[in-house]
From Swiss-Prot:
Domain of life: Eukaryota
Gene behind this protein: Tbcb
Subunit annotation: Supercomplex made of cofactors A to E. Cofactors A and D function by capturing and stabilizing tubulin in a quasi-native conformation. Cofactor E binds to the cofactor D-tubulin complex; interaction with cofactor C then causes the release of tubulin polypeptides that are committed to the native state. Cofactors B and E can form a heterodimer which binds to alpha-tubulin and enhances their ability to dissociate tubulin heterodimers. Interacts with GAN. Interacts with DCTN1.
A GO molecular function held by the record: alpha-tubulin binding
Family annotation (InterPro entries): CAP-Gly_dom_sf (IPR036859), CAP-Gly_domain (IPR000938), TBCB_Ubl (IPR045172), Ubiquitin-like_dom (IPR000626), Ubiquitin-like_domsf (IPR029071)
UniProt entry tagged with the keyword Ubl conjugation: yes
Tissue: Widely expressed with highest levels in brain. Broadly distributed throughout the neonate brain but restricted mainly to ependymary cells in the adult brain where it is concentrated in the cilia.
Deletion phenotype: Mice display significantly longer axons than wild-type mice. Overexpression of Tbcb causes microtubule depolymerization, growth cone retraction and axonal damage followed by neuronal degeneration.
Positions where N6-acetyllysine occurs in the chain: K219
Modified residues (N-acetylmethionine): M1
Record localization: Cytoplasm; Cytoplasm, Cytoskeleton
Designated name of the protein: Tubulin-folding cofactor B
Source organism of the structure: Mus musculus
Amino acid sequence: MEVTGISAPTVMVFISSSLNSFRSEKRYSRSLTIAEFKCKLELVVGSPASCMELELYGADDKFYSKLDQEDALLGSYPVDDGCRIHVIDHSGVRLGEYEDVSKVEKYEISPEAYERRQNTVRSFMKRSKLGPYNEELRAQQEAEAAQRLSEEKAQASAISVGSRCEVRAPDHSLRRGTVMYVGLTDFKPGYWVGVRYDEPLGKNDGSVNGKRYFECQAKYGAFVKPSAVTVGDFPEEDYGLDEM
């Protein structure tokens, strides 16, 4: 198997399982831990993450290694495009049992009974401290979000409605216009600045999802983050439209 010198952030692999006879082609981030990777595989093969054993095979179907370190990154193994990851299920389900849904027993379970079970996704995530059960990570993410919101609020407070401004677009081009709105919105979290451009370089008419924030012509309105806005003496540019 050929492994590139500089690994891409994602990798395309084939997923096979001891529970069925087909393969799935999927793309995953190399930054996933094996524990997180198993959780994603649950939706692909139907096996509980806590009952999985993973094996890595090359594009030539040669066995390379087991993926058995829960806290190791997927990218720390010699995984490259075209490899196959085989899931061995230890839950006791027979081959093909998940392929015919008519054979799957349908039942309901109370939240209390589900909480007591040890082979569920929830119990696995709790033991591995993943997702909402990683209190330290969640606290860190909440603190970072609060910090970003505080910084955006400070930047927004320096921008006044009616001010002339220059906006740095994602392609780094500069666009001039007038500030028409500053504050929170319903369409996305955080603080936003509504701008009426001098030219039809925007994406809306001052409204988003049926709610109007300011008035302007179609394609002249845009909402940008405060960090992309510079207020000052930016007169409307003369494009020579009055010249003969």
